[in-house]
Amino acid sequence: MARYTGPVCRLCRREKMKLFLKGAKCDTMKCPIERRPYPPGIHGRGRIRESEYMLQLREKQKARRIYGLLEKQFRNLYAQAAGQTGITGENLLRMLEQRLDNVVFRGGFASTRNQSRQWVRHGHVTVNGKRVTIPSFQVRKGDVVQLSPKARNMIVVRHNLDTLDRIVPQWLDAVPAEAQVTVRELPLREQIDVPVREQLIVELYSK
């Protein structure tokens, strides 16, 4: 499967904000955006006229990069969100939050979504006691997500549980000692703390 393999800090600089794609490094002064808070490339420092389309595109790219999706995956998810009742933009963000790799990340067991996605792919995550290896799996209310016994003994997992000071969203119940997260309810828009203006994404895809 295709995936981005370039420097992720470059993506943060392109969006002119921290997307927290490198874990602990993003909280330090070593983060490249602290030293170079402008887009990468030879014309990065130049002033660019921000058109309506550019603003819409940047919001879409920002959301896509935060959750680590390719364009086709993101567009398919948008199509599903548009087919549901309710507000399309909120539906999209809710479905992004309900991804299994995101729930593992939100629970504080992984330092980045890339790391949580790798654990799902490698079979280290169970949902209601059954192993699930699909990162895009949509969790539902009442689902219990847990790391396997083998994963719980991994040094990197224990390190994350001991050092990550992440606030677990209200729609999740986390039990760090058991590396377990329970989905209390589906997330509401006010419970999703991503810096994305979803209405601009809807406007972009509605053209």
Which role fits each region the language model picked out?
Residues 119-120, 139:
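Short, well-ordered loop/turn sites that connect or cap secondary structure elements
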